[in-house]
């Protein structure tokens, strides 16, 4: 665990395990049965709307929104993830390699909805990222965000300073392969302040239950309700 004064942030190198991660993500409790259903619910009716998926990974949320009638675009920092997404959505899809922390390759005011599911917690400084996401949104457009719930860090790292912006890493396993992901924790007050400082209006914050159709064998002992991710719907004035 490291504070901001000693570590320069770096993106997780998904290229090393893109296929393994995609396979694990497609049917996992936290992604397939928790995060994606809530992201789709908060995005609302996307038929005929232009939707950007920021940090799209291998594209499952893009596929779901396209199937609901959206005109989708997406970007991710990992070329390997983008290759998988392009295979799923077709070679003519607007899927690009781009960095959430850098200026984005899109014009101003072009998207009705922007989704950013489980990507911002890889970013140390949210200000430039949120400024860019707001820039590409049309006035009145909706930004839907999912992050690791800050309270998860408080529960799992009780000896650490909850109120400090902190870099930490965790190992995951799938089919015998181990991969490491590195995150930036920030307290809830800093999450909310970042959105407000970006000029966004918070219209909803949710801690949902898992999808009612979740296979029972995937659920934890506490059932459908547990603390995992925190979701926001925001509006660009």
Task: Give each language-model segment a name.
Residues 200, 217-237:
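Core SAM-dependent methyltransferase catalytic element
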Residues 52-54, 58-102:
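Class I SAM-dependent methyltransferase SAM/SAH-binding core
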Residues 127-142:
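A short glycine-rich, Lys/Arg-flanked "PGG" loop and its adjoining helix->strand segment in the class I
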Residues 112-126:
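A short SAM/SAH-binding and catalytic strip from SAM-dependent methyltransferases
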Residues 2-47, 60, 64, 81-84, 142-172, ...:
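Conserved class I S-adenosyl-L-methionine
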Residues 104-113:
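A short acidic, Gly/Pro-enriched loop at the edge of an enzyme's catalytic core
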Residues 182-205:
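Short alpha-helix
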């Amino acid at each position: 665990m490291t504070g901001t004064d000693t570590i320069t942030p770096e993106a997780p190198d998904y290229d090393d395990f893109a296929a393994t991660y995609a396979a694990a993500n497609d049917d996992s409790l936290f992604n397939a049965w928790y995060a994606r259903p809530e992201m789709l619910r908060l995005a609302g009716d996307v038929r005929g709307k232009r939707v950007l998926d920021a940090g799209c990974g291998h594209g499952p949320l893009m596929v779901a929104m396209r199937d609901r009638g959206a005109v989708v675009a997406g970007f991710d920092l990992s070329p390997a993830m983008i290759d998988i997404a392009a295979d799923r959505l077709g070679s003519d899809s607007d899927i690009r390699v781009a960095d959430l922390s850098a200026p984005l390759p899109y014009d101003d005011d072009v998207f009705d909805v922007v989704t950013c599911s489980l990507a911002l917690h890889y970013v140390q400084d949210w200000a430039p990222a949120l400024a860019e996401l707001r820039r590409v949104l049309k006035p009145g457009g909706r930004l839907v965000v999912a992050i690791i719930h800050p309270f998860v860090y408080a529960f799992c790292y009780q000896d650490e300073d909850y109120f400090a912006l902190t870099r930490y890493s965790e190992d995951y396993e799938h089919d015998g392969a181990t991969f490491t992901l590195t995150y930036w924790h920030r307290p809830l007050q800093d999450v909310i302040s970042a959105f407000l400082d970006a000029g966004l209006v918070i219209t909803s914050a949710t801690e949902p239950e898992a999808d009612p159709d979740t296979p029972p064998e995937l659920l934890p002992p506490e059932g459908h309700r547990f603390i995992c991710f925190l979701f926001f719907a925001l509006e660009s004035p």
